[in-house]
Structures are given as structure tokens and as C-alpha cells.
Curated annotation (Swiss-Prot):
Biased composition (Polar residues): 156-165
Name of the protein in its database record: Sericin-2
Cell compartments where the protein resides: Secreted
Organism: Galleria mellonella (Greater wax moth)
Disulphide connectivity of cysteines: none
Length: 220
């Protein structure tokens, strides 16, 4: 269950795995690290200060341990990197029983490298991970979404939309051991020389196990 940008299990492109998210990007711009553990609604860190700099990283890590606590981590940086060579936005959420959701969305107007990853692992129910990258004119676009849950209802979604990018990769990886694992990955490139979309799903042991994956890409 590994694909183009090495998102397998519960770790994705920029090494946000489990409940700790470490994204050490060298450069002279902004780093916004928000980490919370064992709380009802942990951290939502948003960074809008990615001007034209060499590197910019926004890490939001949320971990909750006990039952009936919904740890959600949401990180949105929209349109904030003008001409940045490296811009990363990662969101990681881990909860051991119920309702761990992680969402990461990256919108870059003109960045040469833009990656958005959402990693989510939950031990029991209702684990959903969504990652979306939209670039207007970027040479490299990576969007990876990785979700692993031990029991029920694991769904991952990864989407990349490129207007004029030379490389566009979208990968979605999901593994669940019991029921209802669905992955969907789509990559649309209007004028890109390389466009890759891969989706892999594996489920192991259950009385009724459903696994569906759909992948579509188009380049002009």
C-alpha cells in the first residue's frame, strides 16, 4: 500500500505519522507548530504568512488517547505562498477510540513545489482523512492522504488539480482490518507532462469486508 509519493500506512509525504508531526524544513520563513495531546478538540493551527520565501512549514499535530474524545486537526493555508520554492502543509490526528479526523488543504498560486498531506490513524471507528492540493502554475504538486484504522469505516480521499504543472502526483492509501475501506484518488492536469494518480487499498480479515478503489487521471 505505497504509491507515488510514498504514503503507506499512516505516514505520508512530509513524515507526519501517528500523533507527532515533524516537518523540519530549512529556510528563513515561518514555522507554526501546534501540538496538543489528550483533549476534546485539540489544535487547529493555520498559517497565512507564506510570502515569497524558500521554505514554509505549518505543522498541526493532535493526539487524543481515551474514549469518546474527538481529536480533530485542521490546517488551512490558502493562497499564501507567492513564489515559494518549498511549501508544506501537514495535518496529523491520532485517536484511539472514536472519531479521529484529519484534513489538510493547500492552495498555492505560483509555487514550484507544493505538498499537502493528511495522516490519520485511529484504533476503533470512523477514521477519515482528506487531502487536497490545488496549484495554478506549479512545477511539482504532491497530495497524499493516508488513513489506517483497526476496525470500521476508514475512508481516504486525495485530489490534485493542476492548471499548468509539469508534474502532478496524487496518491491515496488506506488499510483497514475489518469493514468498509474505500479509497478514491483523482488527478486532473490541464497541461502537464507527467500526471500520476494511484490508489491502493488493503483489508485483511472480516466476515464481510468491502474494499473499493477508483482512480482516474487526464492530461491534455
Amino acid at each position: 500500500s505505497s504509491s507515488t509519493n510514498n504514503s503507506s500506512g499512516s505516514s505520508s509525504t512530509n513524515n507526519s505519522s501517528g500523533s507527532s508531526s515533524t516537518n523540519n524544513s530549512s529556510g528563513s520563513s515561518s514555522t507554526n507548530n501546534a501540538s496538543g495531546s489528550s483533549s476534546s478538540n485539540n489544535t487547529s493551527g493555520s498559517s497565512r504568512n507564506n510570502s515569497s520565501g524558500s521554505s514554509s512549514s505549518n505543522n498541526s499535530s493532535s493526539g487524543s488517547s481515551a474514549g469518546n474524545s474527538s481529536g480533530s486537526s485542521s490546517s488551512n493555508s490558502s493562497g499564501s505562498s507567492g513564489i515559494g520554492s518549498l511549501s508544506r502543509n501537514s495535518s496529523s490526528s491520532s485517536s484511539s477510540q472514536a472519531a479521529g479526523s484529519s484534513s489538510s488543504r493547500r492552495v498555492s498560486a505560483d509555487g514550484s513545489s507544493s505538498s499537502s498531506s493528511a495522516s490519520n490513524s485511529a484504533a476503533a471507528q470512523n477514521s477519515a482523512s482528506s487531502s487536497e492540493t490545488i496549484n495554478a502554475d506549479g512545477s511539482e504538486n504532491e497530495s497524499s492522504s493516508s488513513s489506517s484504522s483497526a476496525a470500521q469505516n476508514s475512508a481516504t480521499r486525495s485530489q490534485v488539480i493542476n492548471a499548468d504543472g509539469s508534474q502532478s502526483s496524487s496518491s491515496s492509501s488506506s488499510s483497514a482490518s475489518n469493514q468498509a475501506s474505500a479509497t478514491s484518488s483523482s488527478s486532473v492536469s490541464a497541461d502537464g507532462s507527467e500526471s500520476e494518480s494511484s490508489s491502493s487499498s488493503s483489508s485483511s480479515s472480516s466476515s464481510s469486508s468491502e474494499s473499493s478503489s477508483s482512480s482516474s487521471w487526464s492530461s491534455a
